[in-house]
Amino acid sequence: MARNKPLGKKLRLAAAFKXNRNPPVWVVVKTKRRVTRSPARRHWRRVKLKA
């Protein structure tokens, strides 16, 4: 990927980066481990973004 990115692409990549994480610990505790993983997790090599 180019070092110099357009601002729109940079913002979309940043939003995807933020969304790609586990749920917070307090959610796991509050649901008594019923919710332990996020269905929207994405691996950088397996699933590519349309950004």
From Swiss-Prot:
Q: Which residues does UniProt assign to the signal peptide?
A: none
From its record, what is one biological process in GO terms?
A: translation
Q: Which InterPro entries match?
A: Ribosomal_eL39, Ribosomal_eL39_CS, Ribosomal_eL39_dom_sf
* An annotated Gene Ontology molecular function: structural constituent of ribosome
Record's GO cellular component, any one? cytosolic large ribosomal subunit
Pfam families per UniProt: Ribosomal_L39
Q: What keywords sit in the KW lines?
A: Ribonucleoprotein, Ribosomal protein
| Superkingdom as given in the UniProt entry | Archaea
To which protein family does this belong?
A: Belongs to the eukaryotic ribosomal protein eL39 family.
Return the protein name.
Large ribosomal subunit protein eL39
Which species is the source of this protein? Pyrobaculum aerophilum (strain ATCC 51768 / DSM 7523 / JCM 9630 / CIP 104966 / NBRC 100827 / IM2)
Q: What is the lineage of its organism?
A: Archaea, Thermoproteota, Thermoprotei, Thermoproteales, Thermoproteaceae
> Encoded by which gene?
rpl39e
